[in-house]
Amino acid sequence: MSKFEAFAEDLGRNYVIRVGYKDKSWFMKFLGLLMFFNRGFMTHYITTIGNTVYFPNEDFIKKNELGAITVLAHEVVHIAQKEKRGFALFAFEYLFPQCLTIFALLTLLAFVWLPFLWCLLFLLFLAPIPAPWRKKFEVEGYTMTLYMSDLIMRQIGHDDDYILKELSLSAVRIDRLNFRGSGYWYMWPWGVDEEFAKKIEDIRSGVISDTDEVYGRVRRSYLNAVSAYEL
């Protein structure tokens, strides 16, 4: 059993979680067509639908097992968010405001009542309008990414200065590509760098482990996976 498999199995004791692969899923291939604005959706991004975490392919995990473990931990945060808020509410909040575009379909009723043509205005929500809930959920998810990076680097034996430098660089990349960039459709261009700077302080001081049980569970699962793999 690989370290990744041991980690996923241990996480399964606390969360209903499955691992799938985009290159083997027709649904993911269809979704990839809809995500035209994110060219790396099928090859570089991991997506959670329900309780299934879809990786691009099996080689993605084999080539960077520790990276895949970090990503799975990130997606567990989204699963926990969904369990807390309920699937329907979580999905609406995460996709808002772009999900409002669906009401443009009411235009099809214009042949019954002409004013339905005004529903074409809902297509404006396809624009990269800031998404406050998506931003909130992804800050929580990427905080887990930084937390796992810190945990793994400490376990490997890197010194504090190196870890702080790497976490800071990672936070800058995450903000630029995923919050300010097209990865999540320019979801939030303001102040995320400052939020991550504070999160890194909380991670390094140990505060963050005491504020959310998800971190404790993920940490235990990772350490259990490392121990099982070394045996």
What are these regions (language model features)?
Residues M1-N57:
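Auxiliary, metal-adjacent structural segments of Zn-dependent hydrolase domains
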Residues F4-A8, P97-L231:
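Metalloprotease/metallohydrolase-associated module, dominated by Zn2+-dependent proteases
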Residues S25-W26, R85-G86, Y184, E213:
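Coil-to-alpha-helix initiation sites in intrinsically disordered, low-complexity, charged segments
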Residues S25-W26, Y94-P97:
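Acidic helix-start/capping segments at beta-turn-to-alpha-helix junctions
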Residues Y45-L72, F87:
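Short pre-active-site segment immediately N-terminal to the catalytic Zn-binding motif
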Residues H74, H78, K135-E138:
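Histidine-centered active-site/metal-ligand motif
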Residues E75-L95:
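Catalytic Zn2+-binding segment of zinc metalloproteases
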